[in-house]
Amino acid sequence: MHVPHTVTDYRDVQPMVESTTDMVAAALQRSPVWERMRTASLPLHARAAYLEQHWEGLKVLNDALETAGCDTQLACALRDYADALGTALDRAHATAKWREHHVTMPSMLEFRRRVAQLVEARNAVGIAAHAVVRLAAAGACPMHGHPHISPCPAVTVVATEEDEEAFAEELSAATLMVLAHGSDVCRSYPVDHDRDASCALTAAKIRNALR
């Protein structure tokens, strides 16, 4: 589905965006990974790895929007959240070098593949849906000293009833991918886990494997 970067007479999907934002926040707060963060049973490096998934997701989607020539307001929101999350992770790691060796979970690889498909198809509706969910997840993430960032901007690429149905379907798919990050972290960092045996991959390892 090829969709222009914006349309003049777009459909109002703001109620859908707001309900999705609330649902994502509630689902994350009930998730096992958040429970382990609350009970301090998740190691600090595992907590950082979890936040890194959302940071990477924000960056991937910003690049996707720019490549597809899509909604610039969504891209700005993604960059703002990525900067805020990156700064929080800089403090957590006490260095910015983690950006070259950050942890990439299996669910992030799946997410990257899906976004690449949407970019190739120039599917602005699908990319916007993933941006909405990722912004909701980033906004809900526990970050010390989290600055106030404006809510998700209006989505202006949904032009038809078919677009609206596709948007709703992609919101659901994006939500499942976001929740999968927490499941990956819990599996990769069980209580008393062996860090060397973790299934987590670093960006450097992935690059080496692709050479």
Each predicted region: which residue ranges?
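Metal- and O2-centered redox machinery and metal/ROS homeostasis
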Residues: 1-211
